[in-house]
UniProtKB/Swiss-Prot annotation:
Residues 155-290 form the YTH domain. Disruption phenotype: Defects in meiotic progression. This is Methylated RNA-binding protein 1. GO terms for biological process: mRNA destabilization; regulation of mRNA stability; regulation of phosphate metabolic process. RNA binds at residues 161-163, 207, 231. It comes from the Eukaryota. Keywords: RNA-binding. It comes from Saccharomyces cerevisiae (strain ATCC 204508 / S288c) (Baker's yeast). GO terms for cellular component: cytoplasm. Pfam families: YTH (PF04146). RNA-binding protein that acts as a post-transcriptional regulator of phosphate metabolism by binding to the 3'-UTR region of PHO4 mRNA, decreasing its stability. Acts by recognizing and binding N6-methyladenosine (m6A)-containing RNAs, a modification present at internal sites of mRNAs and some non-coding RNAs. Disulfide bonds: none annotated. GO terms for molecular function: mRNA 3'-UTR binding; mRNA binding; N6-methyladenosine-containing RNA reader activity.
Length: 306
């Protein structure tokens, strides 16, 4: 079967099978799958085109070609285009469009599938679109966004407020951190009282930056033998503890203001002080936001970071 390829923006494409499946005996499952794939494709295309001047020029050029060709058939050998020069093959298309040849005409089956589709906790899942978007943006940013992160039950979450971007970078490269005397005491107590297998996660934010910049796991209690001379005023910090950075990327405060902290007079997490503890459920939600938010991917590891 000949495939017809679009000369529109990258990843916006269809084939003749799509047209053939537009029949009266289609199930709701077919329609929802097609719509889901099309929406993901359009969202990703819009973001890529708007944020990449080169792609804008490519899209304009391709549209001009389409006009000149008029009604002539355009084959994939001539005008196939996708980011990273990956061929638009059937296997790639299946990530966005999935069709069933066994059409189920049972209304009950359709209704059951529709209810199941709506009940899925989609906001907790990382879709193919999000995974692919993050893979592409890793080339634009040095951000660290793991596809999966082990967060055991009864883990605890704390906000870390740093006065300096330099201190945060040195923490990343040296794998240690130290708070104030009071903050260190609070974190040490939390670490010692952890249930078996649980962890302590730290949400880092630099004062007056208007954003959070990453997540680190506390992997030791306070130690005297760690080198705190990496910071400008080592006498101020004294003891330190080991950390392992698990996420490095920015999340703007406006995306986090909806998370209210009961132990801090129901103020947003963005108004938290250093070592403010965050409820488990909110901590999980923020981790998911770090992992899945698919716009404005920047990190303090980028050369142009400000």
């Amino acid at each position: 079967m000949n495939q017809i390829w679009s000369t529109g923006p990258p990843n916006f494409y269809f084939n003749s099978e799509w047209k053939e499946n537009k029949r009266n005996d289609r199930t709701i499952e077919d329609s929802l799958r097609e719509l889901d794939g099309l929406i993901h494709s359009l969202e990703r295309t819009h973001i890529e085109v708007q944020t990449n001047p080169k792609l804008k020029n490519d899209v304009t050029a391709l549209n001009d070609i389409n006009k000149k060709e008029n009604k002539e058939e355009i084959t994939h050998e001539n005008y196939t285009h996708q980011i990273n020069s990956i061929p638009l093959t059937s296997s790639n298309l299946n990530r966005h469009f999935s069709f069933s040849r066994d059409y189920n005409q049972s209304d009950n089956s359709n209704n059951n599938y529709y209810r199941e589709y709506l009940s899925k906790p989609r906001y907790l899942q990382q879709s193919t679109k999000e995974q692919t978007f993050n893979e592409i943006n890793k080339r634009k940013s040095a951000a660290i966004i793991p596809p999966w992160l082990n967060i055991p039950e009864n883990s605890r979450f704390f906000v870390i407020k740093s006065s300096s971007l330099k201190h945060v970078k040195r923490s990343f490269y040296n794998g240690i951190w130290s708070s104030t005397h009071f903050g260190n005491k609070r974190l040490s107590e939390a670490y010692k009282k952890l249930n078996s297998g649980a962890k302590v996660f730290l949400f880092f934010s630099i004062n007056t930056s208007g954003r959070f910049c990453g997540v680190a796991e506390m992997v030791s209690d306070l130690k005297m033998d760690l080198d705190t001379s990496i910071w400008e005023d080592e006498q101020k910090y004294g003891k330190a503890f080991k950390v392992r950075w698990v996420i490095v990327r920015d999340i703007n405060n406006r995306s986090l203001k909806r998370f209210l902290i009961p132990s801090n007079e129901m103020k947003p997490i963005t108004h938290s002080r250093d070592t403010q503890e965050i409820p488990y459920s909110i901590g999980i939600s923020i981790i998911n936001l770090f992992k899945t938010q698919d716009s404005d991917i920047f990190s303090f590891l980028d050369e142009t970071y400000e």
